[in-house]
């Protein structure tokens, strides 16, 4: 009997994986077709209505204006978005696109995370890619989105931070539980040296210590990419009230996917225990 | 309504359960039972009625879990943030808890038969005193049972729990039981209210909300999270099966991530031991460069003495916590 059950179980899971693969295939291909159709129709439409071609700079400006306007029409916009990648295969260009779109919509803080520390190890590659996509998608002309790469002075690690309008931070599991442990150690050391007593320790003391080391607000939205249903160690202390929205994959993710997620976020009501 | 339901699963349910059990199963499932009030509103019932039905659903879910071979369940019954609700609702919830925990005390025999151990996680001191005593009695009387475990998070938030764990460690430092350098991820986990349970494998939140709301933040870092849109009083066996299917499909990747994290933990501990040994040697300052062998020995000595310190501290902490419940439960006899 047991082997029969196992066979049925295997069959069931095979079906589920097949369904998942088909959905993923359609997602990618429909998006490509959409692109192809737009590429085909857009010049035609422009050709009919406007003999003078606007050229790439024109489309960039119009896109930029549209993204900015999208950000303003949403009822609420997250202050800090975490991009959590659970997939094995990582496409830097797609992540960079997402980061740039977030910035264009008007999100102030974007963090990028994976549980193996791939982004942290290849920090400079990601930052380069972001700069490149920024020029590609938003154009050079705008000073509003000018980007500076800063060395984070307060931290000994060389986190590179894109400052000005938006700040991009690369995170790994070391910023999660480990940072809580480090804060705990710091407090215990203060107790050891009789600077504090154990009674002084409470949620707000720990929270301010953890805020200090991060220098960014708690994320209000996490976009989790991939089929793994887990946060895989992403900032446990900070995601207390974070909305976690799942997306099938970061590969070939489009602006519309991001906008849909932001719309969903804008519709969420937080009752804060009440 | 009783805590323990004895009905068996129907034939179709049993068949499904057996098929699911052919794959990897979660050993510990956590629930955020959300949607009681929305359910009451939808059905045009009193808000309190929604909460009561929510409790009944919990009893039913426990039965399903047991039949599925899940022997540990953690539920979010009342958050510290919930004290912000209207006085009427908070009082209603406290009354419900009083009823249910009193009922629990009358079901001793049944609990013993099934070996149900009930733990209450949270800051009990925030609750009315009579409820504290009731809860302590329920906890103390089922403490020895070890077949299945129900953890009820009451007056709980995860940040509060973590801050409390840090406080306990600082207390250990004050008492001279441990050093500040002994603080590690493993030690912090052991100081949480949930120290006696493994981390949940699966966390289920109902009613379509997609956040953790300050529940088991530390413990579910590497758990499968499933958000379902059904309201808690309408939760069914099939919803549970769907969540388990999702768990099974994520299982391999999560297992891998857990493994990676465990390796990282071991490395961190080794690194920390090495730093401590280096510091000690520097302090002694005999200046003689040590050879590899004696360095290795010093490291081994240090880590075994650290482990002993930590063990001693955790024993003391456990005693302290047990004593807290014992004192509370014996208070009622006097009163």
Curated annotation (Swiss-Prot), chain A:
Topology within the bilayer: Multi-pass membrane protein
Cofactor(s) named in the record: Mg(2+)
Major localization listed first in the record, in broad terms: endoplasmic reticulum
Catalysed reactions, semicolon-separated: n isopentenyl diphosphate + (2E,6E)-farnesyl diphosphate = a di-trans,poly-cis-polyprenyl diphosphate + n diphosphate
Keywords: Endoplasmic reticulum, Glycoprotein, Magnesium, Membrane, Receptor, Transferase, Transmembrane, Transmembrane helix
Enzyme class: transferase
GO biological process: dolichol biosynthetic process; intracellular cholesterol transport; protein glycosylation; sprouting angiogenesis; swimming behavior
Stretches that traverse the bilayer: 1-23, 33-49, 95-113
Annotated glycan sites: 122
Gene Ontology molecular function: ditrans,polycis-polyprenyl diphosphate synthase [(2E,6E)-farnesyl diphosphate specific] activity
InterPro entries: Nus1/NgBR, UPP_synth-like, UPP_synth-like_sf
EC number(s) per entry: 2.5.1.87
Annotated pathway: Protein modification; protein glycosylation
Compartment annotation: Endoplasmic reticulum membrane
SUPFAM superfamilies on file: Undecaprenyl diphosphate synthase
Function: With DHDDS, forms the dehydrodolichyl diphosphate synthase (DDS) complex, an essential component of the dolichol monophosphate (Dol-P) biosynthetic machinery. Adds multiple copies of isopentenyl pyrophosphate (IPP) to farnesyl pyrophosphate (FPP) to produce dehydrodolichyl diphosphate (Dedol-PP), a precursor of dolichol which is utilized as a sugar carrier in protein glycosylation in the endoplasmic reticulum (ER). Regulates the glycosylation and stability of nascent NPC2, thereby promoting trafficking of LDL-derived cholesterol.
Sequence similarity: Belongs to the UPP synthase family.
Additional observations: Nus1 seems to exist in two topological orientations, a minor glycosylated species with its C-terminus oriented towards the lumen regulating NPC2 stability, and a major fraction oriented with its C-terminus directed towards the cytosol where it regulates cis-IPTase activity.
Name under which the protein is recorded: Dehydrodolichyl diphosphate synthase complex subunit nus1
Natural source organism: Danio rerio (Zebrafish)
Gene giving rise to this polypeptide: nus1
